[in-house]
């Protein structure tokens, strides 16, 4: 999770809007941190960095990673572990890795869609209704660790 301090001093996080036809008209609980499956022999922080670059099309900013722990996604099978890094980036220039799915359903036609179709900066309270429900805990943990406003 990339965070920054906005012009008004508010804590902001970068989230990606999930791609594909199911999510195209959704906003509530349709945004996520970049995430993905760990490859064999890979440590979770390396997975987070690799997935960020695959889903955003840019490497994460350099900086000290702050562990945010893990959450269990709805359905209970997928555990997501996250870190936060302070940084800034142009979210208008993302190039997300595509995935394939049959669309329309039962058509037999495979189509490609981006994992994220766009990214955006959100203040924490604006992010809450938009982020995938289980990942909202990461917002709370980030505020606990870095505070709601910059120190100094």
For the regions a protein language model found, what residue spans apply to each?
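Structured beta->alpha junctions
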Residues: 37, 71-72, 131
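N-terminal strand-loop-strand
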Residues: 1-33, 83
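Active-site-adjacent beta-strand/loop module that shapes the phosphate/pyrophosphate-binding cleft
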Residues: 70-108, 120, 142
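The catalytic Nudix box helix
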Residues: 33-68, 123
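Charged phosphate-binding loop/patch that engages nucleotide di/tri-phosphates or the phosphate backbone
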Residues: 120, 124-152
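Non-DNA-binding regulatory cores of transcription-related proteins
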Residues: 111-117
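Functional cleft and adjacent loop/helix regions within the main domain
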Residues: 30-34, 40, 85, 147
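Short, charged/polar surface micro-motifs in flexible loops or helix N-caps
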Residues: 7-9, 20-23, 39-40, 76, ...
